[in-house]
Regions:
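Short, low-complexity N-terminal intrinsically disordered segments enriched in polar/charged residues
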Residues: 1-32, 36, 44
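Short, charged/polar micro-motifs that form catalytic or ligand-binding hotspots
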Residues: 32, 56, 119
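A solvent-exposed, acidic/Ser-Thr-rich amphipathic alpha-helical stretch
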Residues: 39-107
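Surface-exposed helix-capping loop/turn segments at secondary-structure junctions
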Residues: 37-41, 134-135
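A beta-strand edge to alpha-helix "cap/lid" segment located at domain peripheries
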Residues: 2-11, 78-164
Length: 164
């Protein structure tokens, strides 16, 4: 491998690492924005046609639906989540493929109440991303709660790369 090829390889690896870090940052700020009720910043993390697949029975499609989730004054987000929660993402791994990417990880949401802090939800997540003019944006988030009907190895394994 000559110097030019080595330099091309290093540049490609650096670009991928920067993309991975940008996606990791997006997921971190996404959680903070949900916790703090920062609607516009929350929405900025999504593509305009983004889909949030919360459960087998609840999917939100598009910016208007996501905005409704965050800004409905009588909704769960405003009454229970905002300024009372912590969204924590763990065991995160990210795969970039050109202008698309996906991430996998677990999440835990804690809620503070009169009787202390309790785990509200814990589960598996799969995110899809697209590179947009202003950086990476989520196009889809699939969330499945531990103990739900589609929780388990089959859901997780369906997104994992084949073993080499």
């Amino acid at each position: 491998m000559d110097l030019a090829e080595r330099l091309d390889r290093v540049e490609a690896e650096l670009r991928e690492l920067r993309d991975i870090e940008a996606i990791r940052h997006l997921l971190s700020t996404y959680g903070f924005n949900a916790d703090l009720g920062r609607v516009e910043q929350y929405l900025d993390g999504w593509s305009d046609d983004g889909v949030y697949d919360l459960s087998e029975d609840m999917q939100l499609e598009g910016r208007a639906a996501l905005e409704g989730l965050m800004s409905d004054p009588t909704g769960f987000q405003k009454l229970q989540i905002e300024n009372r929660s912590q969204h924590l993402v763990a065991n995160l791994f990210i795969k970039v493929n050109g202008d698309g990417a996906w991430a996998e990880g677990y999440s835990v949401v804690t809620l503070a109440g009169a009787d202390g802090v309790k785990i509200f939800a814990a589960g598996y997540n799969h995110w899809d991303f697209v590179r947009a003019a202003k950086g990476w944006r989520m196009t889809r988030r699939l969330r499945r709660v531990i103990g739900g009907p589609t929780w388990g190895g089959d859901v997780i394994a369906s997104y994992l790369e084949p073993a080499n």
